[in-house]
From Swiss-Prot:
This is Cytochrome c oxidase subunit 1. Binds 2 heme A groups non-covalently per subunit. Binds a copper B center. It comes from the Eukaryota. Component of the cytochrome c oxidase (complex IV, CIV), a multisubunit enzyme composed of a catalytic core of 3 subunits and several supernumerary subunits. The complex exists as a monomer or a dimer and forms supercomplexes (SCs) in the inner mitochondrial membrane with ubiquinol-cytochrome c oxidoreductase (cytochrome b-c1 complex, complex III, CIII). Residues 22-42, 103-124, 184-213 are mitochondrial intermembrane. The gene is COI. It is a multi-pass membrane protein. It comes from Loligo forbesii.
Length: 213
């Protein structure tokens, strides 16, 4: 139900984006609002529709079935990772409602390093929302990798697994490799905005200055 609701919200945001792109200025007539819609649409469709429905629901049912396993390796972890998503969505909605919203188009952190253009708690709420959604995804990925590595019935070697199981396995590994990079970047952004660090160029533009001495 949560995934279906998120899908409907994401679809309505898609329609708004398509309408605005078809005839600019006809619907929203505000660049910042349009960017907020694009950003929210991306997050909602990925973290709150695709992850709970296609991976959390469908994958959790089909992968053990294809492995001959009675269940996932950590059934309770699925539950825990799902219940991180509603508060994450709440934070994302709160970020869009506070001030002018975190509108950055498809990317998240580069344009946000400047406190001048995005002052206030809106971006910080979006960052915390991403942290929760990322933790949820990482828990799910660990569960899938552990299940596929350890829960196959005897005789089902890795090369005999179905392509669907392989695709979930590789996707989970790539997720574990990529999400900490995003987490590090948005955490650096969070400290830049609130603790006076300078991981990103303080004059704006989003250029990292980590290795410049």
């Amino acid at each position: 139900i949560f995934g279906i609701w998120a899908g409907l919200v994401g679809t309505s945001l898609s329609l708004m984006i398509r309408t605005e792109l078809g005839k600019p200025g006809s619907l929203l007539n505000d660049d910042q609002l349009y960017n907020v819609v694009v950003t929210a649409h991306g997050f909602i469709m990925i973290f709150f529709m695709v992850m709970p429905i296609m991976i959390g629901g469908f994958g959790n049912w089909l992968v053990p079935l294809m492995l001959g396993a009675p269940d996932m390796a950590f059934p309770r972890m699925n539950n825990m990772s799902f219940w991180l998503l509603p508060p994450s969505l709440t934070l994302l909605l709160a970020s869009s409602a506070v001030e002018s919203g975190a509108g950055t188009g498809w990317t998240v952190y580069p344009p946000l390093s400047s406190n001048l253009s995005h002052a206030g708690p809106s971006v910080d709420l979006a960052i915390f929302s991403l942290h929760l959604a990322g933790i949820s995804s990482i828990l799910g990925a660990i569960n899938f990798i552990t299940t596929i590595m350890n829960m196959r019935w005897e005789g089902l070697l890795m090369e005999r697994m179905s392509l669907f199981v392989w695709s979930v396995f590789i996707t989970a590994i790539l997720l574990l490799l990529s999400l900490p990079v995003l987490a590090g970047a948005i955490t650096m952004l969070l400290t830049d905005r609130n603790f006076n660090t300078t991981f990103f160029d303080p004059s704006g533009g989003g250029d990292p200055i980590l290795y410049q001495h």
